[in-house]
Amino acid sequence: MKLLIKLSGESLSERGGDGSFYAEPVLERIAEQIRALQSQGHQIALVIGGGNLFRGHKLTEKLSIERPTADYIGMLATVQNALILRDYFQTKGIATRVSSAIAMPQICESYIPKRALRHMEKGRIMIFAAGLGAPYFTTDSTAVQRALEMGADMLIMAKNGVDGLYTGDPKKNKRATFIKSITGSKVLEQNLKAADQSAIALAKEHGLTIKIVGVDMIKSALETKIGSVILPE
């Protein structure tokens, strides 16, 4: 299968640690899980967020910074995370390439869909950075867009601190119940916080299945007993 995995930036740091942006034990666990999926014969691409480094809305709230500028700064944070993952993966023997929607030829490739597909066919992990290269789009939307462009069979959204989709935030609402399977239409109707709503709508429109799992269960994401499934219809 061809899989695209969406990782949040926060998943790269360790909760309760020293407050650093990256934690090697976490990076090692992610690398091991990616390797496990790859060893099963799957082609894998990643989209990484930048929330561990920067969130644009926080800057616009504190300073007179326009939203597009803040969004571009957030895109740069995703590039930094992508480079960290690339180099770390390669120290573990996992061939990896970074493709950026904003041209940065000194440090990574520019996003060219056919080239990215070729890397995946050769067994390399592909990391897509800098979002879609335009403001007002989240990395959730980027993940759906790249999954569709790459012809992915499934988008795996790896969540930090939860094991799937719930009717509410299980950390704040003890009555929140786990959802094993649901359609994209129901997610939108019930305003469930699975992902950005525009991302869910895009996946629904184009028939893309989304699997939501905990970040520590990436290697088992294809097992039916793991996580939650958002079906197009």
What are these regions (language model features)?
Residues 1-233:
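C-terminal catalytic "cap/lid" subdomain
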